[in-house]
Amino acid sequence: MQKVNKKLNKVYRHPIILERKGNAIQNNDGSWTKSEWVEFRRVFANVKNLHGEEYFIAGQTNEQGTLKFYIRFMPGLNNETKSSYRILFKGKKYNINFVDNINYADEELELKAIERGMTDAAI
């Protein structure tokens, strides 16, 4: 099932899962249980690879696992909260490293994400 945003002329054809990092839990003995990732929302996205100049600017390390995900606007997902979310796409996990509310229109978000394991921020 394809979702089309006619105003932006984009097809959201790829199902992705956004996960949110849960809170760490303190056990009865005072130790802490590591926080788990939990499914936050299933959405459809337009997915693109970085290319050209954009690829080289991002290329501080091996950025071949960097993708751009375009999704409908979601309140609360922004650059301040990006580390609390990650993306599951085609069996791989992606850490979000940039969120752009395109033209501040509150209609669509561009999420730049790096495949987990290709960055030191892999949690």
Question: Where do the protein language model's features map onto the residues?
Answer:
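Short, conserved turn/kink motifs that form compact alpha/beta structural patches or helix kinks used as
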Residues: V4, R20-I25, W32-I123
